[in-house]
Amino acid sequence: MAKKPIKITEVVLRDAHQSLLATRMTMDEMRPILPEMDKIPYFSVECWGGATFDSCIRFLDEDPWERLRILRKELPHQKLQMLFRGQNMLGYRPYADDAVEYFVKKSVANGIDVIRIFDALNDARNLQTAIKSANKEGAHVQGCISYTLSPVHNNEYYVKYAKTLEEMGANSICIKDMAGLLTPYTCYELVKELKNTLSIPVDIHSHYTAGLASMSLLKGIEAGADIVDTAMSPLSGGTSHMATESPVSYTHLSAMRAASSLVR
């Protein structure tokens, strides 16, 4: 039986410029590429949430909700994805449950399809309201493992936490390696253990800060990861992500799970 092709989440419209350009990309700077991006069969396009909401208001004199509506109109064939900080929403402190519920409701109503939800401390209690609300609104809920290194943060810990998120209602799990600390063989082992334990897809999100991401994602693909996060090459590398062209090219030229349908 043929292996399922690897899927791509494109982060150039959110995490890539948040990492390299302090989230200063304007809507006018995004618009020229959107028609071409809409032709590519991504799993999702991450384009909202994280620091974009704050940056639109604080620095760019833009309405973040209007940005989302424009992206929804310009990318009609894509699943739009946002990053959501659980009980902190898109802010920097915890908010009341009813605020979280209403924000999730309006995010989906204005065009969001996939909500990636994380808590920096991996405290599942801070994700309960967001996961429940996102499921209620019909969004794809992606629960996150916030990856780090410490005496207690090992693969057993992460697999147990991921299983908790699945039981809470997550539709997929993201290994969210914000600092670029995930090494290739650790990634392989972690993905293998997650795939053996979970019944939902596994996504790998790893920043290029330490120069490890391309090798780590490759080993993750070999281990059975379903989705990888990448950024188109002009905004890849550094503190951003592996270039989208890399896994597409490699899987196309090898016997791996080809992502070559993304080639244009």
Where are these regions (language model features)?
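Active-site-adjacent beta->alpha loops and helix N-cap segments on the catalytic face
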Residues: 60-65, 120-137, 152-156, 180-194, ...
